[in-house]
């Protein structure tokens, strides 16, 4: 197995992901939201690029859907939930379909459709993502959502931790960028302290979303790996 990293949704190229397993990472906060929602009984998640798409789906069956997401880290007017994973409790999402649109995460997911498999990853399920990627036995590309097309420290160190989880189990080849992410994690295992330097972290902190930051920086608290297949994110727990 070989592991590579793409540093933002804007840098995804078909030839880099074709026939490979992609792990999409937007730990602050879209992939953390998706993982949490499904873990709390959400039936499935539909990621879309625009607010208009989300509203169109929602109006087809208002009882079935919950709308979530953000623009510039803020809740979208008229949506049920923001991009805070802590809002997606069992009471809110159980047996519902979540329609989500975010600035970076949903773009990274939709941009990865040429991959063989698309796994949804974050710190909160990193070790389980490592297990799933090993079982799939393909080369792996970790797609960092980034922030508005730019590199994000938070996604990068999360990728480093995922690589750390993999290399504890099997031997892998790493590209230079993947090796760099691993090195950064190994030098900074206290992730929440390290990412205080990140611009995206500072933006979320400015909004006083301290609990979100603490939650998203917890390692391996969820044991599922949602997968994006044919426009829908689900988790078949029987395969793990």
From Swiss-Prot:
Swiss-Prot/TrEMBL keywords: Hydrolase, Magnesium
Keyword Transcription annotated: no
Enzyme Commission no: 3.1.3.71
PANTHER family linked: 2-PHOSPHOSULFOLACTATE PHOSPHATASE-RELATED (PTHR37311:SF1)
Cofactors demanded by this protein: Mg(2+)
Family, as annotated: Belongs to the ComB family.
Pfam families: 2-ph_phosp
First-level EC class: hydrolase
InterPro entries hit by this protein: ComB-like, ComB-like_sf
Catalyses which reaction(s): (2R)-O-phospho-3-sulfolactate + H2O = (2R)-3-sulfolactate + phosphate
Top-rank lineage group of the source organism: Bacteria
Record-level Gene Ontology MF annotations: 2-phosphosulfolactate phosphatase activity; magnesium ion binding; sulfopyruvate decarboxylase activity
Organism annotation: Clostridium kluyveri (strain ATCC 8527 / DSM 555 / NBRC 12016 / NCIMB 10680 / K1)
Signal peptide segment: none
Protein name: Probable 2-phosphosulfolactate phosphatase
